[in-house]
Amino acid sequence: MKLYFNANNKATLEALEQCGVKNVMLSHRYSYANINKFHDRFESIFVVAGTKGDPDKYHEFLKSKKEYYEYATQFDVYYDMDATLKYWRQEKEMGIDWTVPVLQGNYTHHLSQLRPEPNSLVCLGEIKGIAELEDQMRKLPGNLRYHGLAKSKFIKNRIFESVDTAAWISVALAKKSEIWTGS
């Protein structure tokens, strides 16, 4: 399993590099201007559209900086499957056929709309409620690969090929945290 560390500013990127981190996740909002300066410092860069993004700017970034990242999510809208599907289709029409789809809301219904090829990588986005999230994760088909966006809490579930530390960062920024003891 790959763990992608979120790094959305220069200081965090430098600290992660000094710690020997190999995989980073970057928000377009914070990386569009300087991804070419640090792409060779990490083995794998995963780009996400982030919140409050501009779809046109993100799509231009995806096309112009493709050689600097390994993975990039599609432009998605939190909790909104229909809007997320609309952007997925637009990207395909624009020739941006390498983005990783992001499931929002009802994962299985969203998958039925996408119809990804077996062994495709798919990101799990937002669902309201932890019970619903856990139920939806149990129903996921086994013929796909999954990245858990801010789903590192479920690292033991073993359904994910990769997860990221977005949830860790948001907790740290909120100045509220719990210490995980591994039990």
Segments from the language model and where they lie:
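Alpha-helix-loop-beta-strand connector modules within alpha/beta enzyme cores
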Residues: 38-48, 89-96, 132-154
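Conserved, mostly hydrophobic/aromatic
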Residues: 16, 48, 100-101, 158
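Distinct, well-ordered alpha-helical segments
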Residues: 83-88, 108-116, 132-138
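Non-catalytic, usually N-terminal nucleic-acid engagement modules in DNA/RNA processing proteins
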Residues: 1-89, 174-183
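Glycine-rich phosphate-binding active-site loops on the catalytic face of alpha/beta enzymes
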Residues: 126-128, 133, 151-153, 157-183
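Catalytic cores of alpha/beta
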Residues: 60-63, 109-114, 142-144, 151-165
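Alpha/beta enzyme core
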Residues: 67, 94, 106, 111-119
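Structural preference for beta-strand elements that scaffold enzyme active sites
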Residues: 2-4, 21-25, 41-46, 69-73, ...
